[in-house]
Amino acid sequence: AHVGNGGSIAAVDHGKCVDTSMGLTPVEGLLMGTRCGDVDAGALSFIMEKEGLDGHGLSDLINKKSGVAGLVGGSSDMRDLEAAVEAGDERATMVLDVYNYRIKKYIGAYAAAMGGCDILVWTGGVGENQWATRRVVCENMEYMGMKIDVEKNEGMRGEEMVISTPDSKVTIIVVP
């Protein structure tokens, strides 16, 4: 899981990438800092008509004015979003919930398609530094053998570290 201001999930089988959350462009997939991620194709023509956009205007909207920044109505920086959540901002809480849900959804989908998961690698700005996102995404994944060590996860700073419990069937690792 490479998550930061941009982000993608890749399914890797024996060292070969067999699927990725990004499509022809990086817009498909996860909710990102300024990119919308997966969106109903019918919504695009609706937005174009409603907002009077041409193709370039729509591209600008979904690449530069959507995602976390568009939903929260401000910054795309996850540190700002987490600070707003800690301050009790309900909209920021909803945005962070959506952000985390989309990551979990892709991990679960790829694990199902591949018949399981052996290792989950976290990288990118959020993957490396936001212990709360790692915790929330890995919570309730015990059914597939994934158990996060809460203390290791929260104590991890700037170094490669395994953050799964010793009895976890899935190795969870952070790689800066």
State what each model feature region is:
Residues M48-G74:
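Oxyanion-binding "anion nests"
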Residues D60, G67-G70, M78-A113:
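Adenine-nucleotide phosphate-binding core of ATP-dependent small-molecule kinases
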Residues T93, D97-C117, G127-P176:
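Internal helix-turn-beta structural module
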Residues A1-E49:
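Glycine-rich phosphate-binding loop of actin/hexokinase-like ATP-binding domains
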Residues G33-G37, M48, L71, L96, ...:
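Hydrophobic alpha-helical scaffolding
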Residues V3-N5, V121-N129:
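Glycine-rich beta-strand-to-loop/alpha-helix junction loops that act as flexible
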